[in-house]
């Protein structure tokens, strides 16, 4: 699985968010994995799709309460609460 994680990270880092999301979605059809949802969230953030990213982080945090997605979700909730109160309802 680490090889897939690395590929998704590399695609996201070079700006190929469509490729990263396609690869993450392909693997998520095979198994529900917190790491994949976290990386999917990262790709969605880079693509500017923040609401979808928060949903991916939320799913990852439900699968694994120790996932880095927990911190990412808290960060985005804080940002949304501060800047976008009218666009986000907890």
Residue ranges and their predicted role:
Residues 29-30, 62-63:
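Structural marker of alpha-solenoid helical repeat scaffolds
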């Amino acid at each position: 699985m680490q090889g897939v994680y690395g590929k998704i990270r590399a695609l996201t880092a070079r700006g190929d968010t469509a490729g990263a999301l396609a690869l993450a979605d392909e693997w998520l059809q095979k198994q529900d994995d917190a790491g994949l949802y976290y990386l999917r969230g990262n790709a969605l953030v880079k693509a500017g799709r923040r609401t979808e990213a928060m949903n991916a982080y939320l799913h990852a945090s439900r699968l694994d309460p120790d996932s880095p997605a927990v911190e990412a979700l808290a960060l985005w909730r804080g940002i949304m609460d501060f800047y976008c109160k009218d666009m986000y309802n907890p």
